């Protein structure tokens, strides 16, 4: 896969920030880069960064934003935790090593006209066992890397109050969870969805 050089440089620079768990992280990245759709998966089926490598670009954007927010609001969180949760928060969107979660939608233009509305470029792979994105993220990552409670909470609850299941953590979010949620939303709704230019 030919990744945009700027994206690759940003990605590689962020990976170097993981130092205390460098070996675990390197093994995880090797697995993701060589056995999964991590480098090619879209970030969504029809919205932000709905294109090849969109998930990787989104994860890099979130990591960079999270580091900036952390610097300003809560410098006690280390670089390593920021990069790890940013890279893993939507990891479940890759699906499984042998099956992607998001598949190209091969609906013909004629069929699309029959629907009377635009057809999403990607569709969900219904052959995979249903797991929420955060649960699949942990399922994929935990065999390779140990996570702190705060990192686990951040990954599981990064969608904040947008998800009904997350109500149980309301008012009990760690600073890392709050910052990841904001970095994720900022990028998905403002930067990547084009609102910056509206």
Describe every region a protein language model picked out.
Residues 32-35, 66-69, 158:
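Alpha-helix boundary/capping residues
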Residues 1, 197-198:
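C-terminal end-of-chain micro-motif
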Residues 10-14, 65, 136-140:
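A general alpha-helix detector
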Residues 43-51, 57, 69-196:
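Divalent metal-dependent catalytic cores for phosphoryl transfer on phosphate-bearing substrates
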Residues 1-41:
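Non-catalytic interface/linker regions that flank or bridge core catalytic/transmembrane domains
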Residues 4, 18-22, 56, 145, ...:
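Generic detection of long, well-ordered alpha-helical segments
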